[in-house]
Amino acid sequence: MSLFGTTSGFGTSGTSMFGSATTDNHNPMKDIEVTSSPDDSIGCLSFSPPTLPGNFLIAGSWANDVRCWEVQDSGQTIPKAQQMHTGPVLDVCWSDDGSKVFTASCDKTAKMWDLSSNQAIQIAQHDAPVKTIHWIKAPNYSCVMTGSWDKTLKFWDTRSSNPMMVLQLPERYYCADVIYPMAVVATAGRGLIVYQLENQPSEFRRIESPLKHQHRCVAIFKDKQNKPTGFALGSIEGRVAIHYINPPNPAKDNFTFKCHRSNGTNTSAPQDIYAVNGIAFHPVHGTLATVGSDGRFSFWDKDARTKLKTSEQLDQPISACCFNHNGNIFAYASSYDWSKGHEFYNPQKKNYIFLRNAAEELKPRNKK
């Protein structure tokens, strides 16, 4: 905890390492830079579970690689290992015991990476890129869930090359989240499906989307009893929906809010609207972070319906984010998210992962 509770080591010391004496805005929040960041856009981040001592961070990138760092209490990051796919890596997750990392790729496969032996084996196959991967640990089974643009959701026993179950989706699979016993899947055509995972996965409910534009990211949140109770859904139109599965008062409890838009005070001027690239809930406080194509992160209190903080603007989009298991560290990736197409891609631009002390800034607003 030493550095993640002090200001020493934050400062601007991290910027001079890269030989840039000029002031630039790649790290306006003066956060800690992860060493040896990927060489192309960073699509996903995931911290190790609490079962593992210490903190380990995994990132997947469009350079087809998956990297692992140890994050020390001092804030120093040590590259530990790396694995490759033959296409961009779109998602990563951990097994509950922290011994394995699962990776999903545009090469239409998913792999299981054993960290102790540094061996990776293929565990899943789709007919199109695999968009997300989640580990499910139930009392009577454990499996890996993969979703693909081939319009299927598949569940895999890692010991078998054939899926345990295949569920057809109405459209291409865009994003998902899992907190046992709930899974939420968002598809093209603004489709939303909730699955229950007890005994075996099955469809629970289809939900009319609270958002009018393409779904981009989704994250499940818990109630005071630590049970999954709803989800936050982000779209390409700078908006997030907070949706409870069984709210006492749906019209009052479910709501949407605008975010990741240019702050034009002149209301007659057109507003720039950016995609919400990621949503992460703080594991202790239940507050949430959003990151966007505008190059900012924001922290929110959904219960008080208020914004806690917005960052300064980075010089490129924030493509992914996550919290570590106790919520002390907020990790976010600064890299091109392809939201403006290939003509805006600059291969000379460096990609960064930053670590921020999140213990205080995510505390809920005091209720008056």
From Swiss-Prot:
Purpose: Plays a role in mitotic bipolar spindle formation. Binds mRNA. May function in nucleocytoplasmic transport and in directly or indirectly attaching cytoplasmic mRNPs to the cytoskeleton.
Protein name (record): mRNA export factor
UniProt xrefs under Pfam families: WD40 (PF00400)
Keyword set, alphabetical order: Cell cycle, Cell division, Cytoplasm, Cytoskeleton, Mitosis, Nucleus, Phosphoprotein, Repeat, Transport, WD repeat
GO biological process, one term: cell division
Record PTM Phosphothreonine, positions in chain: T229
Matching SMART domains: WD40 (SM00320)
Region (Disordered): 15-34
Record note on quaternary structure: Interacts with NUMA1 (via N-terminal end of the coiled-coil domain); this interaction promotes spindle formation in mitosis. Interacts with NUP98. Interacts with MYCBP2. Interacts with USP11.
Similarity-based family: Belongs to the WD repeat rae1 family.
Subcellular location: Cytoplasm; Nucleus; Cytoplasm, Cytoskeleton, Spindle pole
UniProt source species: Macaca fascicularis
WD repeats mapped onto the chain: 37-79, 84-114, 125-157, 168-206, 215-255, 271-301, 310-346
Listed transmembrane segments: none
GO cellular component term of the entry, any: mitotic spindle pole
Lineage: Eukaryota, Metazoa, Chordata, Craniata, Vertebrata
